[in-house]
Amino acid sequence: MNEPLYLYCFLIFIAAGWVKGVTGMGLPTVAMGLLGTVMPLAEAAALLVIPSLVTNLWQLFSGPSLQVVLRRLWLMMMFIVIGTVVGSFMLVSIPPLWAGVGLGVALIIYASYALCRPAMHVSARLERLLSPVMGLVTGFVTGATGVFVMPAVPWLQSLRFGRDELVQALGLSFTVSTIALAAGLYLHDAFHVRQLSLSGMAIIPALLGMWLGQKIRARIGLRLFRLCFLLFLTVLGLEMISRPLLA
């Protein structure tokens, strides 16, 4: 990596950590979207592993409901691992230009869902039936694009968790997705010691950005910030989808 690229990555992780500090999520989504503009997605995903793992473990252990969350979600988490390891083959084998298209589609689908915010509530019976399916699909999307949010986020929001439980449930899903993605990349020879050290260096700007985001969260209009963030993801997704047409 040359010096301008180091600086760009440093700023990306500050921005991604800042978004997570303000909203409680978004670090992998922002980081993958922006890193994907300057490097292959497999490299971007490898760079993301440690800062994503550290910040999501922080979120996972931030409340008192870990045992409750684990009891409800262990089966979904198991299928996230399976889907991610399988899907990661696509991330390392598809040409970077077309992998970027997949990431762009994932960003737009997530932003569209979050902008519309349809109200969904799932019964206990459907939860038992669909949790493995949602885990498998989330894992496959994670493995193929490096983005953890679809359909895990809307699914977890539909399960009627309390506020603190939902924060920990999201932390659990993102933590498992991060570990599974690292395992998938390693199995496909796309995660090496050099990338581990670079990923470790990214912890500092990510935590700095997260701290800044938490500091200013109470001072900014969260609704307006969220709208601008989702519109930004949509524009970024459209740009990634358009690349093959402009190549």
Residue ranges, per PLM feature:
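Selected transmembrane alpha-helices and immediately adjacent juxtamembrane segments
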Residues: M1-V38, M120-L170, S177
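Hydrophobic residues within alpha-helical transmembrane segments
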Residues: L11, A15, I50-L57, W74, ...
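Hydrophobic alpha-helical transmembrane segments in multi-pass integral membrane proteins
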Residues: A44, V86-M90, F140-V147, L181-G184, ...
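Selective hydrophobic functional segments
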Residues: L47-P96, I179-R223
